[in-house]
Curated annotation (Swiss-Prot):
Ranges where the C2 domain occurs: 609-736
Full protein name: 1-phosphatidylinositol 4,5-bisphosphate phosphodiesterase delta-4
Cofactor: Ca(2+)
Gene Ontology terms: cellular component: endoplasmic reticulum; nucleus; plasma membrane
Residue positions binding Ca(2+) 4: 650, 652, 676
Region annotation (Substrate binding) ranges: 26-53
Keywords of this entry: Calcium, Cytoplasm, Endoplasmic reticulum, Hydrolase, Lipid degradation, Lipid metabolism, Membrane, Metal-binding, Nucleus, Phosphoprotein, Repeat, Transducer
Species annotation: Pongo abelii
Length: 762
């Protein structure tokens, strides 16, 4: 594929013109619009920009970081500048993770189309690369960076500089011996294939070679039977057949003669270990593998809080981009805070704050466009409506007209249900969650439990009022005043709420006696955590028949997150996260929903679906079978530099392993650090964990740069469910702080899970 990329770079007209470069206007806001010169580098993998045509250039973005290309009409920012900048000449580069979009405006429609076609072609090529092709391209990229004078050759001085860039601290004499061995032309420089040989010598994996030789009779190859023994004994793939082992050899053995003889060379063995089949995440858990025919309340549902915000809760920007990003990452419940807007059009923003405002109809149109691009399973619009009767009618009209048949406006088949429908039954449908009028209610309604700005303070006041009740007269006046200020619920909007009627939570007993399966309560994180401690088993039982939504405390004005695991432990289905904020909590959320096709629905364990369940997340007892996990952290590969501006700095990496689950299972351990080696550090240390409830456990592997003077710096992480972990020798491919792949950066581990014998407490 790397060669296909090189072919395209020399033949495709769009790519040839992009390599010449051209001026475009870079747009950050209505007031920031600067002319920059953009050029595709010769490697076809990076785009650089400069302030002037012949000025000093710097990297703008890597093709591997690009998710998609959108035309100007789809850009919220460019649309707001349509009178000043022609939309037809604009386009947007959308990146993976949480990186901001790049809005560009070319000098002509033709130039804009050329860049859009060219960039999309490159993105498609990179997306279809396998591990070896990505490695080849990665090497090509390093060669370009190391070849400072761009003459297509690398001197030893350039190689020394490159080693520092690659995080390698190496004895100069040893480095020179590798350089001379690779310089087969004896020219004093390394070219193309010579550099590849130098890299292979540099990255020789002694620990993998030793493993290979321990199963190979002659130390040169693995026969079909030897490879089958390895898969069954070490990789714990007990059901592996000769046919499956042969498929793996055919896929990963690079030589045709090896394939014909059904043997695996050292290169093929390493290729297998670095592939998805050798990954710690079980490939069987990547597609949709769970039963999707159970009621909605039997699933954890990927949920977003204040989806419209791309910044903080007080002054941040509101944007439809928040909905696009949430939906494209598999989020199935998005929040819409709706208020009266000018000209009779409802607006979405964080009420009573300085956050910017967007039109409700634009949000609905965005949901209609992106709802099912990543997952076919239902999307829930969680409406927080603060509008007048008239603007509620406008909301209902927009929902009906824009969503069309996607909107679920009646029960399935018109039949009165006895339980919530399943994700399978609701494929490609959009459900409205909100207040609903019933025959018993009048048109004035009590708002759902609010998401207050000062949750903890209000809780303190609540507890005070419990012991010091208001005088009855004052209380009645307060209620009358409150009643007058409440908006009136519009029947047209109410009628669109079918299965997800919002109700205030009073107690578990009250819910059991007065509420129905199609009603849903929202809890602040503080209240939910308190209920788990005080009545954990009741909360679990409540969540077996009714949906619960949990949202972050109003004190989190910086859009920080809580740990969703604590709420999942009680079976809470919709744990809403501030998805715009990267960090440990979002790593756990992303890792949890990476399974099951990334569809946004994960089936809860059976003990969280049984209405008679005795499970208490704070005090888990039998019949759970505890498991012991042994992790040998063996080595690391091509770990990135933390501070790329310091050319001479090299990381001192250590690996931290964290377990999140029920409180008794939460633990962390770490290795020692390896000094001055981010390229191929070796640890060889074993960590041991005992877990009581593996069905709820999440593992997070974090690589840190040790710093004796201050806090260790983050290098990369990977988080996954315990139940999706493969045993044996596995590679863990690291992700950045914002969730972007850091390939080829990885750590190599050995995983062994032992089930405790019944009654064994040792």
């Amino acid at each position: 594929m790397a060669s296909l990329l090189q072919d395209q770079l020399t033949t495709d007209q769009d790519l040839l013109l992009m390599q010449e470069g051209m001026p475009m206007r870079k747009v950050r806001s209505k007031s920031w619009k600067k002319l920059r010169y953009f050029r595709l580098q010769n490697d076809g993998m990076t785009v650089w920009h400069a302030r002037q045509a012949r000025g000093s250039a710097k990297p703008s973005f890597s093709i591997s970081d690009v998710d998609t290309i959108r035309n100007g009409h789809d850009s919220e920012l460019l649309r707001s500048l349509a009178e000043e900048l022609p939309l037809e000449q604009g386009f947007t580069v959308v990146f993976h993770g949480r990186r901001s979009n790049l809005d560009l405006v070319a000098n002509s429609v033709e130039e804009a189309q050329m860049w859009m076609r060219g960039l999309q072609l490159l993105v498609d090529l990179v997306t279809s690369m396998d591990h070896q092709e990505r490695l080849d391209q990665w090497l090509s990229d390093w060669f370009q960076r190391g070849d400072k004078n761009q003459d297509g050759k690398m001197s030893f001085q350039e190689v020394q500089r490159l080693l520092h860039l690659m995080n390698v601290e190496m004895d100069q004499e040893y480095a020179f011996s590798l350089f001379q061995a690779a310089d087969t032309s004896q020219s004093g420089t390394l070219e193309g294939e010579e550099f590849v040989q130098f890299y292979k010598a540099l990255t020789k994996r002694a620990e993998v070679q030793e493993l290979f030789e321990s199963f190979s009779a002659d130390g040169q190859k693995l026969t079909l039977l030897e490879f089958l023994d390895f898969l069954r004994e070490e990789q714990k793939e007990r059901d592996c057949t000769s046919e499956l082992a042969l498929e793996l050899i055919d896929h990963y053995e690079p030589s045709d003669s090896g394939k014909l003889r059904h043997v695996l060379s050292m290169d093929g063995f390493l290729s297998y270990l670095c592939s998805k089949d050798g990954d710690i995440f079980n490939p069987a858990c990547l597609p949709i593998y769970q039963d999707m025919t159970q009621p909605l309340n039997h699933y954890f549902i990927c949920s977003s809080h204040n989806t419209y915000l791309v910044g903080d809760q007080l002054c941040g920007q509101s944007s439809v981009e928040g909905y696009i990003r949430a939906l494209k990452r598999g989020c199935r419940c998005v929040e819409v805070d709706v208020w009266d807007g000018p000209s009779g059009e409802p607006v979405v923003y964080h009420g009573h704050t300085l956050t910017s405002r967007i039109l409700f109809k634009d949000v609905v149109a965005t949901v209609a466009q992106y709802a099912f691009q990543t997952s076919d399973y239902p999307v829930i619009l969680s409406l927080e409506t603060h509008c007048s009767w008239e603007q509620q009618q406008t909301m209902a009209r927009h929902l009906t007209e824009i969503l069309g048949e996607q909107l679920l406006s009646t029960t399935l088949d018109g039949v009165l249900p006895t339980q919530l429908p399943s994700p399978e039954e609701l494929r490609r449908r959009i459900l409205v969650k909100g207040k609903k009028l019933t025959l018993e209610e009048d048109l004035e309604y009590e708002e759902e439990e609010a998401e207050p700005e000062l949750e903890e303070s209000e809780l303190a006041l609540e507890s005070q009022f419990e012991t010091e009740p208001e005088p009855q007269e004052q209380n009645l006046q307060s209620k009358d005043k409150k009643k007058k200020s409440k908006p009136i619920l519009c029947p047209a909007l109410s009628s669109l709420v079918i299965y997800l009627k919002s109700v205030s939570f009073r107690s578990f007993t009250h819910s059991k006696e007065h509420y129905h399966f199609y009603e849903i309560s929202s809890f602040s994180e503080t209240k939910a955590e308190r209920l788990i401690k005080e009545a954990g088993n009741e909360f679990v039982q409540h969540n077996t028949w009714q949906l619960s939504r949990v949202y972050p405390s109003g004190l989190r004005t910086d859009s920080s997150n809580y740990n969703p695991q604590e709420l999942w432990n009680a079976g809470c289905q919709m744990v809403a996260m501030n998805m715009q904020t990267a960090g440990l909590e979002m790593d756990i959320c992303d890792g949890h929903f990476r399974q099951n096709g990334g569809c946004g629905y994960v089936l809860k364990p059976d003990f969280l679906r049984d209405i008679q369940s005795s499970f208490h997340p704070e005090r888990p007892i039998s019949p759970f079978k505890a498991q012991t996990l042994l992790i040998q952290v063996i080595s690391g590969q091509q770990l990135p530099k933390v501070d790329k501006t310091k050319e001479g700095s090299i990381v001192d990496p250590l690996v931290k392993v964290q377990i999140f689950g029920v409180r008794l299972d939460t633990a962390r351990q770490e290795t020692n650090y390896v000094e001055n080696n981010g390229f191929n550090p070796y640890w060889g240390e074993t960590l041991c964990f005992r877990v009581l409830v593996p069905e709820l456990a999440m593992l997070r592997f974090v690589v840190m740069d040790y710093d004796w003077k201050s806090r260790n710096d983050f290098i990369g992480q990977y988080t996954l469910p315990w139940t999706c972990m493969q045993q044996g020798y596995r590679h863990i491919h690291l992700l950045s702080k914002v969730g972007i792949s850091l390939r080829p950066a990885s750590i190599f581990v050995y995983i062994c899970i032992q089930e405790d014998l019944e009654g064994d407490e040792s």
